[in-house]
């Protein structure tokens, strides 16, 4: 029943999103006439080689209108982004509900483990579709935007992806990509599933062994302070794996769609680090350990 309700709400939100996008285009078309007038006014001023009081007053009015038009379009786009965020949240809730129903249903046969190639593709898609933080002028990037840490009292929700420190079969500890199943406030412990095992291996971990992944990408052009900087020590997901390893930032992203360039610690190289490898913002988190000597 909950799944049907979610589907109905998603359909409503998609219709609202389509309406908002239509309004965006209308707003843009309406403001285009004003922008053309600004351009023509500047051309006339260049032809006459003077800035008369008339042109100064006219331009002031045109720019005031252009600013108001841009703000109106911006407000519509922000509403559209809110709808997209709500749709993604509902899709995630539906996925978790379906997963729980699958776990506790005896009527259906157990699902097969996901093929590794499919899993890697899903992880790449998750990184690509991570929303970009777009704040209003003067807004500071929130916790879990890029390199910004979670608030001290933050508790990851079921379904959230995290870096989790677990004991491997050989007894060594490693950081893995995991999904939160639950959190016990009484015990201050998480239950997480290893992503690579499709829920077959579950770990109970203290909060200090769990690092929430970013929920927004930071925009290097507007919020560079929300990115890890060159030579900063991090934990990064090694490409084509589901494990996090210590690495140094070689270069932060330059554009919103860019990845980090990182140097993984690797004793097989003379300087102790691998050649630069690209890792998405989604899979780079702070490392609390000290840099190796």
Swiss-Prot record:
Signal peptide: none annotated. GO terms for cellular component: ATAC complex; nucleus; SAGA complex; SAGA-type complex. GO terms for biological process: transcription initiation-coupled chromatin remodeling. It is found in: Nucleus. Residues 194-196, 240-243 are annotated as: Histone H3K4me3 N-terminus binding. InterPro entries: SGF29, SGF29_tudor-like_dom, Tudor_SGF29_rpt1, Tudor_SGF29_rpt2. The keyword Transcription regulation applies. Residues 264-266 are annotated as: Histone H3K4me3 binding. Keywords: Chromatin regulator, Coiled coil, Nucleus, Transcription, Transcription regulation. The keyword Coiled coil applies. The record marks 238, 245 as: Histone H3K4me3 binding. Residues 152-293 form the SGF29 C-terminal domain. Residues 12-88 form a coiled coil. Its main location: nucleus. Transmembrane segments: none annotated. One of its GO terms (molecular function) is methylation-dependent protein binding. The SGF29 C-terminal (also named tudor-like) domain mediates binding to methylated 'Lys-4' of histone H3 (H3K4me). Interacts with dimethylated and trimethylated 'Lys-4' of histone H3 (H3K4me2 and H3K4me3), with a preference for the trimethylated form (H3K4me3). Component of some SAGA-type complexes. Component of the ADA2A-containing complex (ATAC). Chromatin reader component of some histone acetyltransferase (HAT) SAGA-type complexes like the TFTC-HAT, ATAC or STAGA complexes. SGF29 specifically recognizes and binds methylated 'Lys-4' of histone H3 (H3K4me), with a preference for trimethylated form (H3K4me3). In the SAGA-type complexes, SGF29 is required to recruit complexes to H3K4me. Also binds non-histone proteins that are methylated on Lys residues. Belongs to the SGF29 family. This is SAGA-associated factor 29. It comes from Gallus gallus. The lineage of its organism: Eukaryota, Metazoa, Chordata, Craniata, Vertebrata. The gene is SGF29.
């Amino acid at each position: 029943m909950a799944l049907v309700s979610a589907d109905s709400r998603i359909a409503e939100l998609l219709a609202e999103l389509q309406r908002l996008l239509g309004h965006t285009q209308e707003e843009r078309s309406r403001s285009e006439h004003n922008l053309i007038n600004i351009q023509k006014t500047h051309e006339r001023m260049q032809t006459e080689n003077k800035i008369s009081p008339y042109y100064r007053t006219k331009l002031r009015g045109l720019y005031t209108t252009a600013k108001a038009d841009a703000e109106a379009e911006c407000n519509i786009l922000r509403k559209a982004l809110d709808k997209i965020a709500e749709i993604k949240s509902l899709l995630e809730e539906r996925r978790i509900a379906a997963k729980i129903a699958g776990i506790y249903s005896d009527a259906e046969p157990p699902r097969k483990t996901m093929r590794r190639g499919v899993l890697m593709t899903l992880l790449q898609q998750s990184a690509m579709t991570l929303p970009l933080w777009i704040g209003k002028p003067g807004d500071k990037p929130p916790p879990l935007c890029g390199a910004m840490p979670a608030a001290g009292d933050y508790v990851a929700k079921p379904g959230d992806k995290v870096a989790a420190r677990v004991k491997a079969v050989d007894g060594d500890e490693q950081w893995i990509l995991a999904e939160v199943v639950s959190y016990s406030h009484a015990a201050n412990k998480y239950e997480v599933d290893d992503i690579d095992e499709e829920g077959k291996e579950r770990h109970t971990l203290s909060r200090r062994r769990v690092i929430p992944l970013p929920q927004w990408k930071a925009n290097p052009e507007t919020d560079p302070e929300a990115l890890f900087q060159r030579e900063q020590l991090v934990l990064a997901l090694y490409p084509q794996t589901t494990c996090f390893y210590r690495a140094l930032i070689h270069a932060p992203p330059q554009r919103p769609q860019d990845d980090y360039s990182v140097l993984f610690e690797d004793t097989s190289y003379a300087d102790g680090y691998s050649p630069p490898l690209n890792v998405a913002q989604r899979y780079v988190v702070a490392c609390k350990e000290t840099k190796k000597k």
